[in-house]
């Protein structure tokens, strides 16, 4: 398999503070990878760099085989259409209906007629387990779980190869969180997506991840399956994964995923 995301020699500095130094990461196509780390470890910063919202101080990021930065605005836009992004709060347009939020990236293409756009919007709603009547609600009328699903539908509108998620279950109660994790896992498998997510939630991590990338000491400290990472003897890994609460959460999530 080819790499969906390849990061080499990445460094990130804000003023005098180094967030990343000599960070390398290679994510194969079809993987579901969780980025985890302590507060200030740079996991959300790294995701923002993968999305193209933030330039690194140095280093290279390649997405779907192409350099993420450089080559001109048109080439960068074409590449970014090949991946979808779900931000932590959903980032829906508050003045747009659910329908128009999902239709927004389709209309931006300026290639599709409204009948085709309508069919695609309804298809994406069905994919995230929402009903046609939900298309005509406004974001203020949605529950937190529905906002996440609408945002996910919008991120899938252009049929991406790569899906980038920032804290996808933040703010959801345990039942809605478990349901959303199952949905992402199912869509990842059925659509052949590569999924990269930032999470601090161990239930989400265990329920979704084929691999885990642990950020600590300004770099990727470990990158492997959960079971392999748990065998690494390092203070951060012990504190993050092997506390009594963490072990219970991982065991519970694994049972749900089996």
Region roles according to the model:
Residues 51:
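Helix-to-loop junction immediately C-terminal to a conserved catalytic motif
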Residues 159:
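Conserved catalytic motifs of ABC-family nucleotide-binding domains
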Residues 163-166:
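Catalytic Walker B motif of ABC-type/P-loop ATPase nucleotide-binding domains
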Residues 36-38:
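The feature captures the beta-strand-to-loop junction immediately N-terminal to the Walker
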Residues 138-142, 146:
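Conserved ABC ATPase signature
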Residues 67, 115-133:
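Conserved ABC ATPase "signature" region
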